[in-house]
Amino acid sequence: MKLVLMGLPGAGKGTQAEQIVEKYNIPHISTGDMFRAAMKNNTELGRKAKSFMDNGDLVPDEVTNGIVRERLSEDDAKDGFLLDGFPRTVEQAQELENILSDLGTELDAVINIDVEKDVLMKRLTGRWICRTCGKTYHEIYNPPKVPGKCDLDGGELYQRDDDKKETVEKRLNVNMKQTKPLLDFYSEKGKLHNINGEQEIKDVFVDVEKILASF
């Protein structure tokens, strides 16, 4: 079972990825993990990726694609995998097709966890952290007993800059603009399966299982 998992920040992609790899016994392959492994193993591509990252530059597609090719060629990925964080562009998606074709296989499905922007905003902007002990709260899903104060030590709760509304909205807009052509690409290929990510976590996974039952 060869899968790509997609979803905007706050959609619950990480939670579903954990459940998928556990139930179907396939490796969870994320871009970050691939880069770290390539650098740790000191491969030629790993060294190239490190040089770009050390300079604060984006790793170019040719390096990223090469690292993906190396990872998907490993024995544990022969019978299946869950790709997370790749592809991010149509060009990368086309290269993924080439890589899999060279390996004599193809993607089975692309699962997109779909959540409306206003729901994502509520999920992502509701996080507050205790200045004293670091305990995390969410104003909707896990609120403190007294607004603005930590349940454990009464410490002041604060919001990180990257959890503030303006920052979150900008990040979502960038992600939505980047993701749409990719969703269209996989939809035209007949590979795309959209799942309602606004349900309970367990119900989202039930829908995932229904899709994967046919593979």
UniProtKB/Swiss-Prot annotation:
Its EC number is 2.7.4.3. CDD domains: ADK. Pfam families: ADK (PF00406), ADK_lid (PF05191). Keywords: ATP-binding, Cytoplasm, Kinase, Metal-binding, Nucleotide biosynthesis, Nucleotide-binding, Transferase, Zinc. InterPro entries: Adenyl_kin_sub, Adenylat/UMP-CMP_kin, Adenylat_kinase_CS, Adenylate_kinase_lid-dom, P-loop_NTPase. Zn(2+) binds at residues 130, 133, 150, 153. It catalyses: AMP + ATP = 2 ADP. Belongs to the adenylate kinase family. This is Adenylate kinase. Catalyzes the reversible transfer of the terminal phosphate group between ATP and AMP. Plays an important role in cellular energy homeostasis and in adenine nucleotide metabolism. Residues 126-163 are annotated as: LID. Consists of three domains, a large central CORE domain and two small peripheral domains, NMPbind and LID, which undergo movements during catalysis. The LID domain closes over the site of phosphoryl transfer upon ATP binding. Assembling and dissambling the active center during each catalytic cycle provides an effective means to prevent ATP hydrolysis. Some bacteria have evolved a zinc-coordinating structure that stabilizes the LID domain. It comes from the Bacteria. It comes from Listeria monocytogenes serovar 1/2a (strain ATCC BAA-679 / EGD-e). GO terms for cellular component: cytoplasm; cytosol. Pathway: Purine metabolism; AMP biosynthesis via salvage pathway; AMP from ADP: step 1/1. Monomer. Residues 30-59 are annotated as: NMP. It is found in: Cytoplasm. The gene is adk. GO terms for biological process: AMP salvage; nucleoside diphosphate metabolic process; nucleoside monophosphate metabolic process. GO terms for molecular function: adenylate kinase activity; ATP binding; nucleoside diphosphate kinase activity; zinc ion binding. ATP binds at residues 10-15, 127, 136-137, 199. AMP binds at residues 31, 36, 57-59, 85-88, 92, 160, 171.
